[in-house]
């Protein structure tokens, strides 16, 4: 079992129960899933770019990504409905905890000029979204084999009802929020 999951069960639940005066352990917010999304707009011209992006995402997440297709045609971007334009992965369970641990302890500290992530990126319901500009911050990605530096979106979905509860949950995991 992931160390972060054990830490959640042993320390975080008790800490948040005390902080928010929950009457039941089931009221304590938990992380439900982590979604990784990579938009590859250039894939319209070159299908190989999307394959490489999907390969990078599979390496980062440990799971095969789903190829996302355009929902509607946009003439300005030369996109037709159904064109493959990105990929996404939804992590739950053991893989989710492993990814979160690697994100907090290894990947984010490797970002150049890292001062912390914004504490304002909550959606109003306790879910947190952030963007990473380079996929090479993850140690699984071999820098020499990367054809192009791509960014990805990371969404952490929690069962928290408010942003305050969601922020407290992530802060309990030592999530590096900007001061």
From Swiss-Prot:
PROSITE patterns hit by this protein: RIBOSOMAL_L5
InterPro entries per the UniProt record, alphabetical: Ribosomal_uL5, Ribosomal_uL5_bac-type, Ribosomal_uL5_C, Ribosomal_uL5_CS, Ribosomal_uL5_dom_sf, Ribosomal_uL5_N
UniProt-recorded Gene Ontology molecular function terms: rRNA binding; structural constituent of ribosome; tRNA binding
Gene Ontology CC entries for this record: ribonucleoprotein complex; ribosome
NCBIfam families: PRK00010.1
HAMAP family: Ribosomal_uL5_B
Protein name as annotated: Large ribosomal subunit protein uL5
Organism name: Vibrio parahaemolyticus serotype O3:K6 (strain RIMD 2210633)
Upper classification of the organism: Bacteria, Pseudomonadati, Pseudomonadota, Gammaproteobacteria, Vibrionales
């Amino acid at each position: 079992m992931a160390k972060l999951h054990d830490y959640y069960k042993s320390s975080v639940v008790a800490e948040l129960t005390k902080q928010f005066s929950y009457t039941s352990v089931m009221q304590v917010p938990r992380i439900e899933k982590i979604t990784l999304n990579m938009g590859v707009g250039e894939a319209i011209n070159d299908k190989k770019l999307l394959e490489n992006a999907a390969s990078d995402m599979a390496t980062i997440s440990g799971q095969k990504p789903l190829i996302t297709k355009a929902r509607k045609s946009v003439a300005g971007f030369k996109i037709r409905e159904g064109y493959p334009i990105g990929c996404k992965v939804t992590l739950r369970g053991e893989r989710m905890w492993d990814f979160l641990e690697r994100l907090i302890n290894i990947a984010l500290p490797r970002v150049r000029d890292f001062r912390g992530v914004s504490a304002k990126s909550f959606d109003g319901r306790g879910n947190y979204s952030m963007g990473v500009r380079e996929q090479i911050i993850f140690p699984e990605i071999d820098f020499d084999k990367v054809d192009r530096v791509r960014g990805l979106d990371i969404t952490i979905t929690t069962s928290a009802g408010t942003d305050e509860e969601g922020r407290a949950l992530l802060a309990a995991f030592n999530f590096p929020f900007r001061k």
